[in-house]
Amino acid sequence: MRCAATPAEAEALRHDIAGRFQPRAEGNRFIVYDDVANRRIWMFTTQAHPAHPSVACLEIVARNGAIGAEIQIGCFSSAANCAALNREFEARGAQVRQALAPH
């Protein structure tokens, strides 16, 4: 899994993902796509988000018998906007990890 390294790559990735999966909007700041077959969640900012254009790729992984989630973020805004976006996406990743944890 690799998130975009440039704004142009982020847009190309968004176009590719949008052509293969149904979007699941989350408010007006994100568009989310679930790639169930590859256990991935793609999250793209919309123009309403201060850190636009940005993308996060969350992948469900198994390691040493445990299920977890890895997240990569490609942010192409100011340092402050990207730091805020990282906190948002990391919080989402933590929610996924918690949901996957054995109860």
Segments (PLM) and residue ranges:
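Short glycine/proline-enriched loop/turn "hinge" motifs that connect secondary-structure elements
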Residues: 58-64
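A mature extracytoplasmic/lumenal domain signature
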Residues: 36, 45-48, 61, 71-77, ...
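Short, surface-exposed coil-to-beta transition loops
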Residues: 51-57, 68-70
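N-terminal secretory signal peptides
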Residues: 1-53
